Amino acid sequence: MKKFRIQGPCSLSGEVMISGSKNAALPILFSTLLSEEPIELKNIPELKDIDTTLNLLKQLGVKAKYQPPDSIMIDAKAVNHFCAPYELVKTMRASIWALGPLVARFGRGQVSLPGGCAIGARPVDLHIFGLKQLGAKIQIEEGYIKASVEGRLKGAHIVMDKVSVGATLTVMSAATLAEGTSIIENVAREPEIVDTANFLNILGANIQGAGTDKIVVEGVKRLRGGAYSIMPDRIETGTFLVAGAVSRGKVVCRHTQPATLEAVLAKLHEAGAQIEVGKDWISLDMKGKRPKAVNVRTTPYPGFPTDMQAQFTLLNIVATGTGVITETIFENRFMHVPELIRMGAQVKIESNTVICHGVERLSGAGVMATDLRASASLVLAGCIAQGITTVERIYHIDRGYECIENKLRKLGAYIERIQGAQ
C-alpha cells in the first residue's frame, strides 16, 4: 500500500493549475445516463472516484473512452443493466446518483446502499423521498435501493426536509425526463449543482433556479448529446491557498473561479493573507508571516464549506492565537485531529467543535489518513512540520486530488510516493 514521505519544513510558493471539479464531474457523469446520444465531457480530473464511476457506468452498458489530456466520450445508448453493484458502490457514496437517471429514462434502477468516506451518517432518505414524490416506487431489500415507475415519472411540488447537495442532484436530474413541471424547494445552492444544471440544459433539459433555494424543472421527453467543460475544483483551490497560508508562502491558483470561494477567501483575509483575484485566478501572499487564528462555522453554500474544515483546522493549529471551528454539516468529521496531535498540535474537541491553540511549529510523525479532506490536511501538515512525516492510506487523497504530490513539488515541497508495508 502506497504512502507519502514528506521532508519539512518548507515554504510553499509558486503557481498551481487547478483541475476540474470532482464534486461536479461525478453527478455530471451519472447524468449522462439520461441521454442516448454521444456526450463529450472536458476538464475531467484523473481521480480514483472518476475511475470508479466510469467502471460503474461501463457495467451498466455505457461506452466510455478517455481522450487525452482531459476529455471523456460517453455513449449511454446501449445501457442494458440497471443495477449498480455493491462491489463498486461500497467505495463511493456518489454512486447513489445513478438511481435517479436510471428510473427516469428506463423506468427502473437499483443501487446498493452506498459506502465512501467514513464521515458520520449520510442517509439516503432524502434521495428516496424526492424520487417517491416524482412517482417512483421504492423498495429497500437485500442491501439495495430498488426504484421503478410505470411510464414516466410525474412532475411534482417537492419541499426537501433538509438542505442536501446529494438529494438535490438526484431529484433535479430525475425531474428532467419527468412528465410536467417539478418545483423543488429548500434545495442546496452549491456551484456544482449549477454546473450540473448547466450541463443538462446544454443537452436540452429545462432547468431554472439552480443556485437558489428553489429549482423549477420543465420535464422533456428526451435529451440530446453535446459537449461540456467541467467547472474548476473550488475545494482543491482552497486547499492550495491554505498550503500557502500555513507555510507563510505565496501561491497563485490558476484556472479557478474566485466567485465560488468568497467565504473561504474572507477567512483567509481575516487570517492575515493578502488576497488578489482576477477572472480565473487567485493569489495569496503571507509575506512570510504566521496566519492569525480564525473562528469558522461550516454551513451550506454560500457559507463556509465543510470540505475546507480540516484544512482550516491545520491553519488554526499553526496560527497565532486561539481559533474555534464548528462543524454543522457532518458529525464525526474531526478524525484528522488525533493525527495532528501526534505532530504537536494543541487541540481540544468538544462535541462538534474543535478549539485550536496555535503553536509555533509541528514535528514530523507517522500519521494515517481517515478520509479525503482530512488526508489533505495531514499532507500539508507534513510539508510545514520539522522532520519527516509519513502519511498512510493515501488512497483517500487519490479519490479527490489530482497528482497532489506533483503540484506540491512545483511549490517547493519535498514529497514522494513510496511503497509502504503490506
Swiss-Prot record:
Record: active site: 117 (proton donor)
Residues that bind UDP-N-acetyl-alpha-D-glucosamine: 93, 122-126, 162-165, 307, 329
Segments forming a coiled coil: none
UniProt pathway: Cell wall biogenesis; peptidoglycan biosynthesis
GO BP term, pick one: cell wall organization
Keyword Cell cycle: yes
GO cellular component term, pick one: cytoplasm
Taxonomic superkingdom: Bacteria
Modified residues (2-(S-cysteinyl)pyruvic acid O-phosphothioketal): 117
GO terms for MF: UDP-N-acetylglucosamine 1-carboxyvinyltransferase activity
Positions bound to phosphoenolpyruvate: 22-23
Compartments it resides in: Cytoplasm
InterPro entries to which the protein is assigned, alphabetical: Enolpyruvate_Tfrase_dom, Enolpyruvate_Tfrase_sf, MurA_subfamily, RNA3'P_cycl/enolpyr_Trfase_a/b, UDP_GlcNAc_COvinyl_MurA
Documented EC number(s): 2.5.1.7
Class of this enzyme: transferase
Keywords per UniProt: Cell cycle, Cell division, Cell shape, Cell wall biogenesis/degradation, Cytoplasm, Peptidoglycan synthesis, Pyruvate, Transferase
Catalytically driven reaction(s): phosphoenolpyruvate + UDP-N-acetyl-alpha-D-glucosamine = UDP-N-acetyl-3-O-(1-carboxyvinyl)-alpha-D-glucosamine + phosphate
HAMAP family per the UniProt record, alphabetical: MurA (MF_00111)
Family indicated by similarity: Belongs to the EPSP synthase family. MurA subfamily.
Record function comment: Cell wall formation. Adds enolpyruvyl to UDP-N-acetylglucosamine.
Name recorded for this polypeptide: UDP-N-acetylglucosamine 1-carboxyvinyltransferase
